[in-house]
Amino acid sequence: VSHLYLVMDFLPGGDFMSLLMKKDILNEEESRFYVAEMILCIEAVHELGCIHRDLKPDNLLIGKDGHLQLSDFGLSKMAENKLFPLSSSNQSNNSTENNYSQLSPRQKELTKTNHNELHSKYQAQRKNRLWAYSTVGTPDYIAPEVFGNKGYGQEVDWWSVGVILFEMMVGYPPFFADTPSDTCQKIIKWEKYFNIPLDAKLSTNATSLIKAMVAPAEKRLGLNGAEESKKHPFFKNFDWKAVKNLKPPFIPEIKNDWDTKYFDKFEETDPFYPRENRVSKH
């Protein structure tokens, strides 16, 4: 065998991050549809006995029909036992209880940024896709227990869903900071930093759902399965069995099967897209 061919679905609508960049903030009806599809995606992964571990807007792709599909299973693991952090030997002394019982001066400084300032900074940063590609991993959606030394399970994916819902409705992730290191500090001491700004004007049910997911692992909504989330008042009268038949808020306008207008355009000198890997347009 000299060649290996991978046959995959082509999802021409781009990724969900691109949609968020375009829309900035989604209304409650739009957010309800997309978070419902995310819940179904994670439910399917968990039913296979897996943990996705890398749920973020960039890994949610939009199909020709406008529906979401989950991608990038490079960090996924089977959930037979509790998993330990990415580097437990290095992180063993970094548990939330042991090392961050008091906020450092730098951490206290992080709490002072207001809603409008965070929103503006995040909008500028996420529009810089080259910056995004050059960053090895994004910590914004990682659950706090991943940084600890007690292990974790499928509940980490539900934290990520809550963070993405917050971003959809507020305009930035709840623990966004100027640097990945500062973001990690915020997540580790999340109870000190987590706040839903009144300026965002979220409904009671939306606020309740976010707080139920961005919560301690042992109390997190979804810990006992996706049905917990489906029964939340935020989804009152939502027809879970008909999701695939619902019209998505955004449907890509595709001219033909080769239309890639919803994908990032790479420059000729882009180091992340070598010339030899490009497909000729002719």
Feature locations, PLM:
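AlphaC helix of the protein kinase catalytic domain
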Residues: M17-L26
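Activation segment signature within eukaryotic-like protein kinase domains
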Residues: Y34-V35
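Protein kinase catalytic-loop region centered on the HRD/HxD motif
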Residues: L40-C50
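C-terminal regulatory tails of eukaryotic serine/threonine kinases
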Residues: F84-A124, G222-H282
